[in-house]
């Protein structure tokens, strides 16, 4: 996908006297210095809905990560491996990103897509996540694309009705199965986690006997490596009843 902001270029090719050339050169150097200072200080242009666009309640950021199977990953190397795709603030901006992204079912190897509220990194150790947890569901191969789309559309549409509790969602593509999860801020709030569970069942049209696992990020941090929920054992790999024309 092309960058949302094109670089500004000065393509003037006419004759200038020496003073104008020096002035232009100085202006260019000043702009470069100002730009470098802005980048080094971490300043970014705020993402806002465009004219006539439909704003979301929160801004969200897409992330992507991929790792080598069987190789333990530290928090530092995991953070370096995860790549930010882009941030959006409206329905229209979301579809501009999503329509250009590979669907989870077409990913290979140990790959993950993450969709989190802007400012929250998809890491257990992030301040917004460290006291929270996630609902985890394992999927048979071939179901991840539809379930992922249903999940993130429900999240963007505020269907979970739990205020600011939702942090984000993850789809993890593995060799024999895929995993989806939704993260919330407060693992100790049983009423909130129960509401998230019930909404997740509804938006994914899960059968009543579907096995769902809630795992706190504190427990995930204690486990060696970055495998987290993939190490949990599930008896049923469910197949949802999808209403397909």
Swiss-Prot record:
Tissue: Widely expressed with highest levels in testis, kidney and liver.
Swiss-Prot/TrEMBL GO biological process terms: in utero embryonic development; miRNA-mediated gene silencing by inhibition of translation; negative regulation of translation
N6-acetyllysine modifications at: 134
Xref: SUPFAM superfamilies: eIF4e-like (SSF55418)
Residues at which mRNA binds: 78-79, 110, 124-125, 174-179, 222-224
Disruption phenotype: Lethality; mice die just before birth.
Localization per record: Cytoplasm; Cytoplasm, P-body
Region (Disordered): 1-52
Binding partners and assembly: Interacts with EIF4EBP1, EIF4EBP2 and EIF4EBP3. Does not interact with eIF4G (EIF4G1, EIF4G2 or EIF4G3). Component of the 4EHP-GYF2 complex, at least composed of EIF4E2, GIGYF2 and ZNF598. Interacts with GIGYF2 (via the 4EHP-binding motif); the interaction is direct. Interacts with EIF4ENIF1/4E-T (via YXXXXLphi motif); increasing affinity for the 7-methylguanosine-containing mRNA cap.
Name this protein carries in UniProt: Eukaryotic translation initiation factor 4E type 2
Organism this protein belongs to: Mus musculus
């Amino acid at each position: 996908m092309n960058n949302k902001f094109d670089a500004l270029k000065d393509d003037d090719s006419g004759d200038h006297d020496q003073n104008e050339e020096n002035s232009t050169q100085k202006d260019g150097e000043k702009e470069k210095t100002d730009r470098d200072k802005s980048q080094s200080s971490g300043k970014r242009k705020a993402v806002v809905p465009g004219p006539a666009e439909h704003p979301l309640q929160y801004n969200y950021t897409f992330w992507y990560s991929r790792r080598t199977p069987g190789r333990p990953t530290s928090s530092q190397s995991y953070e370096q491996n995860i790549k930010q795709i882009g941030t959006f603030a409206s329905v229209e901006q979301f579809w501009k990103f999503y329509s250009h992204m590979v669907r989870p079912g077409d990913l290979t190897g140990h790959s993950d897509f993450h969709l989190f509220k802007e400012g929250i990194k998809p890491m257990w150790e992030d301040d917004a996540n460290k006291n929270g947890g996630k609902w985890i569901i394992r999927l048979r191969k071939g179901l991840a694309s539809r379930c992922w789309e249903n999940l993130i559309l429900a999240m963007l549409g505020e269907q979970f009705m739990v205020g600011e509790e939702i942090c984000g969602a993850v789809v993890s593509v593995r060799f024999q199965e895929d995993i989806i999860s939704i993260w919330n801020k407060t693992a100790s709030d049983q009423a909130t986690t129960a509401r998230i569970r019930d909404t997740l069942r509804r938006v994914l049209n899960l059968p009543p006997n579907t096995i769902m696992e809630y795992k706190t990020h504190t427990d995930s941090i204690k486990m060696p490596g970055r495998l987290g929920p993939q190490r949990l054992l599930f008896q049923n790999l469910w197949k949802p009843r999808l209403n397909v024309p």
